Amino acid sequence: MLLLPAATLAQAGDPADEFAPFDQFLAEFREENSVPALSAVIVRDGQIAWEGYYGWADDEGEVATSADTTYKIASTTKPIAATAIMAEALAGGLSLDLPMRADEGFADTCEWLSQSPIPFGSGGEDRHGNTVSAMDCAKPLTLSQMLDMRANGEAFVYNPIAYARIDRAISGAGGRDLRAIVRDRVAEPAGMRNVALGWRDPEGGDALRFLAPPFHPVDGRLVKQVLPDDDFRAAAGIITSPLQMAKFDIAFDSGVLIPPALIRELVEAEIGPLGDYRRGWFLEDWNGQRLLWHSGWNEQRGSALYLKVPGKRLTLIVLANTEAVWWDNSLVKAEVAESPLARRFLEE
């Protein structure tokens, strides 16, 4: 167990004056929420505008959090994996119309989920009273629809377990291993280094060596947690730093990975009051601005926020080795503005 030091131990560079208040906010957020290691990067106009590193990246309080510190980025893997899958489809390596039932275990997974108490399986309501539809196991489901979280019907329902079957469906239809797809279509062209696509990635570089171990606060003390053993799926599994995620972000916006027209479709898509989910991104409108974002949550182990404001060419990426960044987002409503970190960033 590790006691959180009383003082905030920020290891940030000299942020531009305009980001100084946000820098201070993150330092206070870390201390108030007992987060050992927290890293953040802001991208603006295709360049790194600011970086902040706070706390310690080990369990002895001896290794300061730095640009090298890596985290399990949880579900912020999804937009990265989805982008790679889109690029692979454009290159003719797979069809977006392939059936999810090309995964021989998908039918059994759907049957189990639809009868489970899990809301995105058997249905229910979110905390606002919005309907969460049950999975429709009789409905033919394509890879394209799964990338849009349509396993439960016409409207999106965030269903990470079904999404995690994507790589199996691609392989079952004769496609390449997802790790190879993401490495070739995203990581390499974006210039990402020290990125482990799951624990077993032979090309992960120093990602595992620089990993900040997970913690969970219990009665005012930080208790080190067992690392999850899940490998790499389209839903989660990447281990990297915010700085390397920023390289993905810059390449994504510049059209290096997929054509700009596909990005414009996300920005210009008509969405309802609950927002939408398309190609690995939550879509949300806030004060006249289209937001593309994703959250990440490893229960009692880590959390993440990846938020884009395309109209301002602005991006925020935050990773932490506790679940403090997570805010229990609805399964059927995009509401990143409910996140204290996102709200402060958007209001700056």
Q: Residue ranges of each PLM-predicted region?
A:
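Bacterial N-terminal signal peptides
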Residues: 1-6
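Cleavable N-terminal signal peptides
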Residues: 8-10
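Catalytic loop of the DD-peptidase/beta-lactamase superfamily, centered on the K-T-G motif
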Residues: 12-53, 102, 176, 180-184, ...
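Active-site-proximal loop and beta-strand segments within enzyme catalytic domains
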Residues: 19, 44, 56-177, 216-219
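Hydrophobic/aromatic-lined pockets within catalytic cores
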Residues: 89-90, 151, 170-174, 186-194, ...
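Short, mixed-charge aromatic SLiMs
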Residues: 106-114, 186-197, 269-276
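Carbohydrate-binding/catalytic loop surfaces
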Residues: 121-131, 202-228, 232-234, 282-284, ...
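Mid-domain, small-residue-enriched loop/turn segments at the edges of structured enzyme/sensor domains
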Residues: 142, 159-164, 174, 180, ...
